[in-house]
Structure formats: structure tokens, C-alpha cells
Design a protein with these regions (language model features):
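Short, small-residue-biased leader/transition segments that mark boundaries at the very start
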Residues: 1-2
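Catalytic cores of DNA base-excision repair glycosylases
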Residues: 6-228, 236
Length: 236
């Protein structure tokens, strides 16, 4: 439905890591930065990062203090340290080139199932199933009729996502990006724009009357947490 409606072609955001000219390293950096950080905050940092360290080899030898400073207020600065560890592993194990093989990607420091699948799909065109929070929410609503997915990804969810992917590799990778974009822009956690959704006519959640979630999600407190303290220290 996403492809038949042409929704993604019209509404996809023009993000630099989606450009055909973006290197696999650029895609990897974007995926790490986008973990729990909005696109609007990532964009300027991503550009600065790639200008300063355009290859894994460049980041591998950078002073750690410089890496943390450049990460600035993206939050969760441990991600910056893990990214540098991954860069060093890429240099040591893969001659400085980000590997295409999902298993090799998962073996890098700080790279889990999702990030490995995303890099394999978006950087190398390998039809891995990419399931993030946005994808889980779209599938939960459109297929299962649930307002929100559970707290943790289940095997059943993963099988469902895999079954929905087109068989053609090119379409499968476009599908990954399209469903993620739909969840980010339309099928949002709060106040979804169902009137603008290309899946609304067949959405199980809409058909059920858009019932509220069984469990209302609660955000993590900020004031007084270790994250707040770390952010204040880095900003000083």
C-alpha cells in the first residue's frame, strides 16, 4: 500500500544519510546518533562529525576528549565511545571499511541487531528486516490492531515484520525506510495523523475504533538522573 500510493516518494524527508553518495560509514554514524535522539538534533552533529572524521580510520585515532566534545549534547555520550571502539574494530578487522555482512556488523562494539540490519539494508542494499520503535508501532496498529507495541521486541513481532517485507531486495529496502518514515511522521506514538495515513483504510487499529493503549507509556525522569549530571558536565 505504501508503494502503490506513492506516499514515501512524496513525503520522505531529504536526509543526507539517505543520499546515494553517503558512505556506509556515514550511514553507521547516523544510526548510532539517531538512537534515542531526534533527527533535528542529529543533523548538524552528523554533518560536523563526517567533516571532521570522514572515515573510520580518522575517528579511530582521534583523542577521546575530542570525540566526547564533538558529541556535545546528543545525549548518552557512551554511544560516542562505543562508536570510536567500532571504528577501531573496523580498521583492525576490515581494513578500514565498514563490512556489509550483518554478522560482521553485529560483531562490532556497540552494534546490535537493529543497527546491523539498518546498515546492511540502507548502506549495502542487503534486504535485512529493520525493526525500530516506529516500525513496531506501525505494524502493531495496522496489523495487530494494538495502539502501541509492548516494551520489548518479540520473536512474533520480528516474524510478522519479516513476512510483510517484499521479496524483491530493492523494494524490501525501500519498504524498511518507508515504514520507518510513516511511523516517524504520521503514525506517531501520540496524536497519530490517521487522516493522512496511506494505511488508514486497511488499518486494524482504525477499524477497531482506535482503542487506547492497554498500558500508558511513561517517559524516563530527567531531573536528578545520571544523564542530567553527565550532560551538565559535558556542557561546562
Amino acid at each position: 500500500t505504501l508503494f502503490r500510493s506513492g506516499w514515501f516518494a512524496v513525503h520522505a524527508r531529504d536526509l543526507p544519510w539517505r543520499s546515494p553518495d553517503c558512505s556506509p560509514w556515514g550511514v553507521l554514524v547516523s544510526e548510532i546518533m539517531l538512537q534515542q535522539t531526534p533527527v533535528v538534533r542529529v543533523l548538524p552533529r552528523w554533518r560536523e562529525w563526517l567533516e571532521r572524521w570522514p572515515t573510520p580510520a580518522d575517528l579511530a585515532v582521534a583523542p577521546t576528549a575530542d570525540v566526547l566534545t564533538a558529541w556535545d549534547r546528543l545525549g548518552y555520550p557512551r554511544r560516542a565511545l562505543r562508536l570510536q571502539e567500532a571504528a577501531r574494530a573496523v580498521v583492525g578487522r576490515h581494513d578500514g571499511r565498514v563490512p556489509a555482512d550483518p554478522a560482521a556488523l553485529r560483531a562490532l562494539p556497540g552494534i546490535g541487531e537493529y543497527t546491523a540490519a539498518a546498515v546492511a539494508s540502507f548502506a549495502f542494499g542487503i534486504p535485512e528486516t529493520v525493526v525500530d520503535t516506529n516500525v513496531r508501532r506501525v505494524i502493531a496498529r495496522a496489523v495487530a490492531g494494538e495502539a502501541l507495541p509492548g516494551r520489548s521486541l518479540t520473536r512474533a513481532e520480528m516474524r510478522r515484520a519479516q513476512a510483510l517485507m517484499p521479496e524483491d531486495p530493492a523494494r524490501a529496502n525501500a519498504w524498511n525506510a518507508a515504514v520507518m518514515e510513516l511511523g516517524a511522521l504520521v503514525c506517531t506514538a501520540r496524536s497519530p495523523a490517521c487522516d493522512r495515513c496511506p494505511l488508514a483504510e486497511t488499518c486494524a487499529w482504525v477499524a477497531a475504533g482506535s482503542p487506547p493503549p492497554v498500558e500508558v507509556p511513561r517517559g524516563q525522569a530527567w531531573a536528578g538522573t545520571d544523564r542530567q549530571v553527565r550532560g551538565a558536565v559535558m556542557a561546562a
